[in-house]
Amino acid sequence: MSFSGNDISNLNGLINANFEELEDLTFNTNIISDISVLGKLNFKNLKQLWLYNNIISDITPLGKANFEKLEVLSMHTNKITDISILEKANLISLTILNLDTNNISDITPLKNCKFKKLKILSLHSNKISDITPIQMANFKCLKVLNLNNNEITDISILNDKMFENLEKLNLSNNNIDEKKYEQIINKLKSDIKIFDI
């Protein structure tokens, strides 16, 4: 079900609707800032939630939402700074998380997220400098990691054990020293497609 490009400012219209069988919900390119209603609804079969290109800054309602079957969460191009609620969110089926083009600097909460099925993590165009939490996270199924256009300087934590299944790694447009970059990248398995700095 798509409500994209309609100048919608809130999700309150969903309150009395029956979405028990709904699998895909799209509210892209609107002017939504408040998603608190998501914590009050029963989306027990929802698999995809698209909320990109809005003005959302507070994602704490995700912590109360029933998203056990959610596979895709796309909230890029918003105003998100704090992702700490992801530690508590019930997103055990998540395979794609897209938080590109926000104002995120601290990704520490990722180390405690239970995203055991996560295949694509996209965080490009934020303000991230420390990627250590990704090393500490249990993302063994991760295939694509986009970290381009951030403020990363140190990638020494990158190793094959972190990325057993990684196929694509994008670190372009960061502040990484070229010599150190080459040393680290050369140690990673050769079949990873790497987008150069």
Placement of each model-derived feature along the sequence:
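Concave beta-strand-loop units of leucine-rich repeat
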Residues: 1-8, 21-32, 45-56, 69-79, ...
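A structural signal for leucine-rich repeat
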Residues: 12-19, 36-43, 59-67, 83-91, ...
